[in-house]
Structure formats: structure tokens, C-alpha cells
Regions:
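Glycine- and acidic
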Residues: 111-118, 176-188, 205-214, 284-290
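Acidic/His/Gly-enriched intrinsically disordered linker/tail segments
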Residues: 230-291, 324-328
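Contiguous, non-catalytic segments that form substrate-binding/exosite surfaces or channel walls
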Residues: 50-179
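Inter-helical turn/loop segments and adjacent helix faces that build the functional surface
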Residues: 77-84, 139, 143, 206-211, ...
Length: 372
């Protein structure tokens, strides 16, 4: 039986890191320890909040909320000191990101909730993820993915208690030099693709162990998920369920883009600016909060992933090389990021977003025709 990560180990690491943090006098080392401490606290937060309490109903909810509140109070100050970075933004970049989001949001406004039919256990998810990364046959990615997936003590499985809960997260420990993967189990095919996606973030961590995670780190996760969809479809594995998952992904980002744009367009009214009904980019830039900037960049990351998948499908060696270049890239928050050298300039991304919008509409049209 596999020895997966458990809550006792998280708490033991947290106590050790907390002691290190209190004793440390070196500012650089203090930041490294601080990020690792946050990673373990967030992992504990995630693991406890979702899977530790066996009590259900209102009492279980109250216990969860109390545990989260207490833990938040304990590390809120530390979290605030370290998490100060935000994506670079100027008028031109904001205008570009909003255009990109508009295309993605135009895909289809209807929310889609997938119903995955076949059951899937942990062993099947682990084996499937290993087979996929071995199939990739990349000398930089495949061995690291195998290393991550073989270290089961750093993989945490939590029971899903709410259908609205997200699927997984990865936390980075710079003291123990390890990524911790947490999977919210649905006991179906989603667990496999969540594991593949989170493992990709672990690979990026080993390629470039950077304290300040850039806003584009999830590109590699989206790329691996898309490649995995194609791999398992080609092998005639759960094709109907995979088709549902792909529709779900389209739906999620269409909704995400719509929600982001709605919040952005409501900002001038909230700030009592004059141009409430027709805000310009300059006015939005003055009031847009850090989280909405991150949301816009996340949409760009999703479009970039689609572009890299197309590159890999056309020329596997070149496409994977571009992906690895991105994974190792130093992306500054002091200037606008430039992805021309990996074939993802602004014009390319806008064209990709338009194509995604049209494909999304066609997918939904065919889906509803089948249901009639």
C-alpha cells in the first residue's frame, strides 16, 4: 500500500519551520523559511478544511470555519509581508489583456457542469499520470515527473465534501526543496488530470526554484492537461468522459473571463469616477486591484497554453523547447512580459483567443444538437 502524505507530517514540518523562522537572523534565509512555512500552513489549511473533520452538516461547517479563522490569524502578518508582488500593468498591456478576455468570454455564456460517469481510484490516477509523462519522452520533463510521482509521501489526497470545491493545489517548500501536491478526490477521471496538472507545477519548481512565483506558472499545467486529453483519447481511454472534461474547461474559462470583465467594468462606479457608463482604460488602470490584474494575466496564461499545445502538435521538439524556455524564464513585475521568442506575440495570442471563441461556440452548438 502506498504511503501518501498525512496531516501529522505536515504539522511536524510546520513546527520545525516555525522554530527556524523565529531563530533566523539572515534576511534572505528568513524569506526562504517564511515562504516554506506559508506553504506548509496553506497545505494544512487545505488538507484540514477539506478532509480532516468527519462531522458533517452545520456543525462540521462551523468546525471548519473556526479552524480556518484561527490559522488565518496566526500567519496573516507573515503572509502580508511576503506577498507584495503584483503583475506589471500599463495602459497598453491592460487594453491588450481586456481584448484577450473579451474574446475568451465570447466563447459561450452558458455554464456547463460535467457529469463524469466512470469511477477511478488513486492507483489508477497515479499509474495513468506516470504513463502519460513517460509517453512524453522529454529528457528534462519526464524524469522529473517520474521523481515527483514516485515520492508518494509528498502527495496528499483529500475527500471532496462539496461539488463546488476546486480540484487540487501545489505548494512549494524551499527548505526541504519539494513540491507538495494536494488532490481533492472525486474518485473519477478528474483525479487523473488534476494529478497531471499539479505534477507539471512540480516540474516547473525543480526547473527554476524561484521564491517569487510568476503569474504565468500555470501555463505548463494547462499545456500538460491538454496534451493528456489528446493522449488518452488517442488510446481510446474514457473518451466520453474526456470530452465532458474538455467542455468543462472551456466553460470554466468562458465564465472566468466574463466574471473578471464584469468586475473590471464595475470599478469606476465603485470608485465614484465620472465615466461610470463608459470607463476608459486609463480610469480602470487607476483603480484596478491586484487580484483582477492577476485574473487577467491568468486568462492570458490559458491562451498561451493553447498556443504551445498547437506548437507541440505541429512540431513536438520545438514546442516542448518553447515550453521549457517559458518554465525557466525570469518574468519581471517591473516591465511588460514579452513572449515573442517562444512564438506567442500579442497578435498570435489575439488570433488564438478568437479561434478559441469560435471553437467553443461550435462545441456547444453540436452538444445541444445531440441533446435534442
Amino acid at each position: 500500500m502506498e504511503n501518501y502524505g498525512d496531516i501529522k507530517t505536515i504539522r511536524k514540518r510546520k513546527r520545525y519551520l516555525k522554530r527556524l523562522y523565529r531563530q533566523c537572523q539572515n534576511q534572505i534565509e528568513l524569506e526562504t523559511i517564511g515562504w516554506s512555512l506559508i506553504a506548509n500552513i496553506e497545505l494544512l489549511h487545505y488538507y484540514t478544511h477539506l478532509g480532516n473533520f468527519s462531522v458533517t452538516g452545520d456543525i462540521g461547517r462551523i468546525l471548519n470555519e473556526c479552524a480556518v479563522l484561527i490559522r488565518d490569524i496566526k500567519y496573516k502578518k507573515l503572509n502580508g509581508i511576503l506577498r507584495q508582488d503584483e503583475p506589471y500593468m500599463d495602459e497598453n498591456y491592460l487594453s491588450f489583456l481586456m481584448s484577450l478576455a473579451n474574446y475568451v468570454a465570447d466563447g459561450n455564456l452558458q455554464r456547463f457542469e460535467s457529469q463524469i460517469g466512470n469511477s477511478f481510484d488513486r492507483t489508477s490516477a497515479m499509474n495513468g499520470a506516470k504513463h502519460f509523462y513517460a509517453f512524453l519522452q522529454d529528457e528534462a520533463i519526464s524524469p522529473v515527473a517520474e521523481q515527483i510521482l514516485s515520492d508518494t509521501s509528498s502527495i496528499y489526497f483529500c475527500e471532496c465534501r462539496n461539488k463546488k470545491d476546486h480540484l487540487g493545489s501545489t505548494f512549494f517548500d524551499y527548505i526541504f526543496h519539494k513540491p507538495y501536491i494536494c488532490i481533492l478526490e472525486h474518485h473519477d477521471l478528474r483525479d487523473l488530470f488534476t494529478l497531471i496538472r499539479e505534477c507539471a507545477l512540480g516540474v516547473k519548481f525543480y526547473m527554476k526554484e524561484d521564491l517569487h512565483c510568476d503569474s504565468f506558472q500555470k501555463v505548463c499545467a494547462y499545456v500538460m492537461e491538454e496534451l493528456a486529453f489528446s493522449y488518452f483519447e488517442t488510446n481510446e481511454t474514457h473518451r466520453e468522459d474526456i470530452e465532458l472534461l474538455k467542455k468543462q474547461r472551456e466553460s470554466d474559462f468562458t465564465g472566468y473571463a466574463n466574471d473578471t470583465l464584469m468586475q473590471i467594468h464595475s470599478l469606476p462606479g465603485q470608485q465614484n469616477l465620472k465615466s461610470f457608463f463608459h470607463p476608459n482604460v486609463n480610469e480602470i488602470l487607476k483603480v484596478i486591484p491586484r487580484q483582477l490584474k492577476k485574473d487577467l494575466v491568468e486568462i492570458q496564461a490559458y491562451v498561451m497554453a493553447r498556443g504551445l499545445v498547437q506548437q507541440i502538435q505541429f512540431n513536438k521538439e520545438l514546442g516542448l523547447e518553447h515550453l521549457k524556455t517559458l518554465m525557466r524564464m525570469n518574468i519581471s513585475n517591473e516591465q511588460r512580459p514579452d513572449f515573442e521568442k517562444i512564438g506567442l506575440g500579442d497578435d498570435v495570442l489575439l488570433t488564438l483567443a478568437q479561434e478559441m471563441s469560435m471553437r467553443s461556440k461550435n462545441v456547444y452548438s453540436r452538444y445541444h444538437e445531440k441533446k435534442r
